[in-house]
Amino acid sequence: MNDRIYLTNDGYNRLKEELYVLVHQTRKEVLEKIAEARAHGDLSENAEYDAAREEQSQIEARIGDLESKLSAATILDPKQIKTDKVYILTSVKLRNLDNPDEIIEYTLVSSEEADTDAGKISVRSPVGRSLIGKTVGAKVTIVVPKGELHYEILEIFVKP
């Protein structure tokens, strides 16, 4: 993966912590499971061994993914984010034009930090892609699987 990914310092540290746990804890636990399953004898019909090897494969893939993301990461400083347009790490306040009483707020983040429950949406999501580069007052139509959403951007800001 040579695509640059943009993370907050917290997001970068979370990925680093996950990598540390996988490398120093989980990997060792799985190797112990494999050794234990091997001790049971015939590996050709050993479901325990097969399951442990599958788990090892998944862990090694995740380790590789995390290492790749961390090496391609650019840590963004929220203090340096402009608010003239919607960028990654900006928050936006939107008015639903189909229901003007509904005001929603999103913060645009990388896919790695997206958390819809916390109002953090990926810049690669349909909503994120529709908002990037827009300014206050812009009316946006967002195509989602259920149809179209119509919003007006009321405010662009950076959360502390």
From Swiss-Prot:
The keyword Flavoprotein does not apply. Keywords: Coiled coil, DNA-binding, Transcription, Transcription regulation. GO terms for biological process: DNA-templated transcription elongation; regulation of DNA-templated transcription elongation. InterPro entries: GreA/GreB_C_sf, TF_GreA/GreB_CS, Tscrpt_elong_fac_GreA, Tscrpt_elong_fac_GreA/B, Tscrpt_elong_fac_GreA/B_C, Tscrpt_elong_fac_GreA/B_fam, Tscrpt_elong_fac_GreA/B_N, Tscrpt_elong_fac_GreA/B_N_sf. Residues 45-74 form a coiled coil. Pfam families: GreA_GreB, GreA_GreB_N. Transmembrane segments: none annotated. GO terms for molecular function: DNA binding; RNA polymerase binding. PANTHER family: TRANSCRIPTION ELONGATION FACTOR GREA (PTHR30437:SF4). Belongs to the GreA/GreB family. Necessary for efficient RNA polymerase transcription elongation past template-encoded arresting sites. The arresting sites in DNA have the property of trapping a certain fraction of elongating RNA polymerases that pass through, resulting in locked ternary complexes. Cleavage of the nascent transcript by cleavage factors such as GreA or GreB allows the resumption of elongation from the new 3'terminus. GreA releases sequences of 2 to 3 nucleotides. This is Transcription elongation factor GreA. It comes from Chlorobium chlorochromatii (strain CaD3). The lineage of its organism: Bacteria, Pseudomonadati, Chlorobiota, Chlorobiia, Chlorobiales.
